[in-house]
Amino acid sequence: VEKRTYSYEDAFQASLAYFEGDELAARVWVNKYAMKDSFGNIYEQSPADMHQRLADEIARIEAKYPNPVSAGRIFGLLDHFRYIIPAGSPMTGIGNDQQIASLSNCFVIGIDGNADSYGAIMKEDEEQVQLMKRRGGVGHDLSQIRPKGSPVKNSALTSTGLVPFMERFSNSTREVAQDGRRGALMLSVSIKHPDSEAFIDAKMTEGKVTGANVSVKIDDGFMRCAIEGRPYRQQYPIDAEKPLTEKEINAAALWKKIVHNAWKSAEPGVLFWDTILRESIPDCYADLGFRTVSTNPCGEIPLCPYDSCRLLAINLYSYVKNPFTSEAVFDFDLFREHVALAQRMMDDIIDLELEKIDLIEKKIESDPQDEEVKRTEYRLWEKIRHKTSQGRRTGVGITAEGDMLAALGLRYGTQEATDFAVTVQKTLALAAYASSVQMAKERGAFGIYDAVREEKNPFILRVKEADAALYEEMRRYGRRNIACLTIAPTGTTSLMTQTTSGIEPVFLPVYKRRRKVNPNDPQVRVDYTDETGDAFEEYIVYHHKFLTWMQANGIDTSCNYSQEDIDRLVASSPYHKATANDVDWLMKVKMQGAIQKWVDHSISVTVNLPNNVSEELVNRLYVEAWKSGCKGCTIYRDGSRSGVLVSTKKKEKKTESAVSVLPLCAPPEVTERRPDVLECDVVRFQNNKEKWVAFVGLLGGRPYEIFTGLQDDEEGIVLPKTVTKGRIVKHTGQDGSKRYDFQFENKRGYKTTVEGLSEKFNKEYWNYAKLISGVLRYRMPLENVIKLVGSLQLESENINTWKVGVERALKKYISDGTEAHGQKCPNCGQETLIYQEGCLICKNCGTSRCG
């Protein structure tokens, strides 16, 4: 039977009705999750069709086992994203015969034994690419690569160390397209490795390792040495009793560098590796192939080589009865019932994944390539199949933690809210483990279950203390899944649940968004024009559950409130002082550590800090994370990579008074006299049909001045396309007039000079260029300069086109990973735009926009 197809507009309108007018959620669903073929045909009209597809497939697996759950009941759990939300890969892939891809969200690869040869490294590189083309994020550990300068028996004579291979793996990630986005990669290394300092510094060089997240695996011994000021011993191999290389380092100095780099650029992340291994249930089976070596790209699933995980989130907000009222209460009975079903559904999805692996292997077999070419990919999926079926690992998580707490009248970051969040997570953990034990009775335990191996595991001991009867049942019957739980960032799925994401607080209860408009329509207001000439109107957006709070408290949601009114509303709401940038930072870290006790995998969470915090605060947060039992910690200091949503509220100064005293901010360093010669980058760009070139003068590697003009025309600037760097030379005449020349070396080393850059400018642009160079000279933060350029209100269409080119040229110098303040992704609407090589990339949906 030929399947019915829908036009984009049909699907969008049906989804718009489904989401009750939420245009952003509707577009996200149609663009990312509706079933499509490679020709763009859409086979689902609304999320109801998708949920029916998922329910039918999961029920098909249920029918293989005793006491099957019906498709109708499963659909009821999924419908309107109310209770259970599979992550993107399962949601897209289950029952989808239009693509051959894995249902797994994340993988870790690696080689057991010696893995420091070129052959082993190239093999991991190929495996990484093969997984990413099937939609998976990948992590792998570099601790087995020998340190720089080690003797090798090849023509090089000594090893190059870790960093060149970081760049190789990063570049491979950037080459792979997954639904129009790049792959996700995590690279980790042990702090014991002699090259760990080079690893920690690798991303501090602009443009390096831009395709990977990097995290350093820190052991308890290092932390104690760093805190107590004692030396620490590094060695290679890191676990060898008789290492080939040893050196003693200043642990405090290396720790200070980790803190500084995290403060400056949000990387590296830290993984408290002894905590991870000590708490890991799969590591009870390390000698059977379940030794944890790295994590997935977001850090919430530590994994052994060739294992994978599929994720699912439970919407906590939906279990609050009478939300935002004095009668609000959490329905623990319904929650336990649904957690048990969620764990069961996750186990069913493992069977569906094994079916997908069958299809992948058949596809590989049928490919026309030579058998030798196909061998690595085929064997890769064989290893993944083996680990998947052997451990049956699941990732049951949560979302809407922030909204749940607000709906109950609890302020995120307080001790009361933390205690309740721990109670909810403990309830979830016990219910999920009880469900896994019940499935072991009905379906059989995972193949290598051994109660004796697990009896001293701290997580299992907590289960035993909390529910002795469950523990005894588990010892008798086993458990269906080697590990069950996680808390992941829920990304775009939180747009469809219309809640806060994962364990995070609300980002902003009120913010600005842009809507494309017809600039010729007299009824609209144009606030922004992008590089293509599209016009946008800015408007105020309320977080969905903030609107629910307003309605529950009899506040008119249709009124056009002033900024002062909005500020008063937020201040009187349960979201006051509970946003991502407002929460008590130490309490957030302690909350993560407390909840971690009831999560057998890990938690992905970010501590958002204002720009003016000191490195000492970052140090205290990291140390507190280690002491609190966190398995990892990520710090993001506002502006360290620049860019987030624009808050509508008036700025309130927040200090570190509760933690440490903040030193006065030093004024920017300004060079009063321009050097006669500045290094210069040449940046080419195209606006409409015109080719432009920008000469960006650099002082200390930072833009100091800019000249732009047309190239390749009679009056323009003619340069070989190979020229990307040079010097801007300033000449001052006897009459005080100034001239700026561009000088470069050709391939043969001869200098060529292009005289009179200022004369190459159209006079129409000259004053604007002087303005921009002026603010660059006086060290305005670069992202603010770009905002200033973008905000220029210019009547001439030509100048508007030119200013976009200037923005594009300057964006090149914003550090990769810098968040884009005040901008939302035009595709998914999330506040997750970051700068990457001068382009804006959405971390959630992968949409990119350059210019």
Regions found by a protein language model. Give the residues of each.
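Conserved, charged catalytic cores of large soluble enzymes
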Residues: 2-68, 154-168, 178-290, 321-326, ...
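Short, cysteine/histidine-rich loop/knuckle motifs that typically chelate Zn2+
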Residues: 826-830, 844
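Short, Gly/Pro- and small/polar-rich lid/capping loops
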Residues: 471-473, 648-698
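Cysteine-rich micro-motifs
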Residues: 838-848
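Function-dense linear segments that define catalytic or interfacial modules
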Residues: 35, 57-63, 77-154, 162-165, ...
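Terminal amphipathic helices with adjacent charged low-complexity linkers/tails
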Residues: 218, 279, 284-286, 296, ...
